[in-house]
Amino acid sequence: MIKKDTQGVTFAKGFTAAGVKAGIKKSGNLDVAVIYTKTQAVVAGTFTQNKVAAAPVYVSKEVVATGTAHAIVANAGCANACTGQQGLDDAHKMAQIAADELGVNADDVIVGSTGVIGVNLPMDKLEAGIKDAVANLSADGLSLIHISEPTRLALIS
């Protein structure tokens, strides 16, 4: 008999996760997620080969290059792509906000964004969403099940 995994990203022991509505997506759907483990996890990643990449790609490449991480924080509704230095600063700040809330170093936080291109992240909404997600981290992971399939795949891939 095949057992269906209803736990999602927290199926592995030691992982917690939460998805929240921060008001970034116009639809009002869940748009910020945090996945966290207290134990530093081995990480690997594949990234776009395009000459133009979103700011979170550059930040996350730096984290993945270290080989370990504690968390992933991602948002939907704003891709933080084609946003120049402000986008890079925002991606680093996104990692720092999550790190501060989780009690880890910012270079242990992978970041991801998906959504509208050419728009800066609404950092006030994102910061509130990250704090809300961290406050609601759970080992059941059920809050992430309700995130749209493409976003969920982006968050865990």
Segment roles from a protein language model:
Residues 28-31, 52-54, 66-71, 104-108, ...:
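Short coil/turn connectors at secondary-structure junctions
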Residues 81, 96-102, 111-127:
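Hydrophobic alpha-helical hairpins/lids featuring a short glycine-rich hinge
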Residues 35-68:
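Active-site-flanking structural segment that lines cofactor/substrate pockets
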Residues 1-48:
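N-terminal amphipathic/basic leader segments beginning at the initiator methionine
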Residues 121-144:
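Glycine-rich and small/hydrophobic secondary-structure elements
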Residues 35-36, 73-75, 111-113:
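Short beta-strand segments
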Residues 73-102:
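Alpha-helical support elements that line or immediately flank enzyme active sites
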Residues 145-157:
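Single conserved hydrophobic/aromatic residue that forms the stacking wall/gate
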